[in-house]
Amino acid sequence: TIYQLRSGDIKITDISAASPKNIATINSDDGFAASELYLHDGKLIVIGTRQMFYPMAERIAPDIMPMPPMRPKTRIYFYDVTAPESPKLIRKFEGDGSYMTSRLAEGSLYMVLNKPIATYSMTAESVLPAFTDTLMSSNGNAVSRSGIGFESLRYFPDTVESNLMITLGFDLELMNKAPHKMAYLGSSTNLFADSESMIVALDRYHYDYRAQGGITMPVFANTTELYKFLL
């Protein structure tokens, strides 16, 4: 069976016969852009970003069009595909921030999100990441909401980015178990993971602040720092 991620949907094709046959199609919700999928032990995991746009609170005078307020959110869909011709949604998870990267290792899914901190009209609510976890069942959907408080925020030394790096860890064998969540002041685009540890790579720019006799180009050194987390 082939699972093909396309623009707007996922096509499931049976290739066991002489002629391939489309047996199911999973359509995406409005505003959701899938970017990655995993297949593990009868489960299909679809990861993507959903843009949240909000209308202006009040009418403004004619002027240059402002950037519309938007809050990127990462959404993960978990499907039961033990019967590929009838995929069944069993869980939906949504969290603040843009999806950066993920790794699947030994039945666990590890993920990194980046949440920009908007300094304009900043509030405590806008800084702290929030999450919504929905479990589907025949008896109805169970929705739980959670977040990460200021007392749980961590930071990387010498961080200057106004950004939160959020790490998520899902146990794919226990769909009812809440994911492990952490948030760090800083940002990263590279993640390495195995069954025992996760390594995050961060770019660092070291500027030369020595006084110059005239106007010169700024001098800096670019390095990469690695941080290892035990899983």
Whereabouts are the PLM-identified features?
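Beta-sheet-rich non-transmembrane sensory/scaffold domains
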Residues: T1-L231
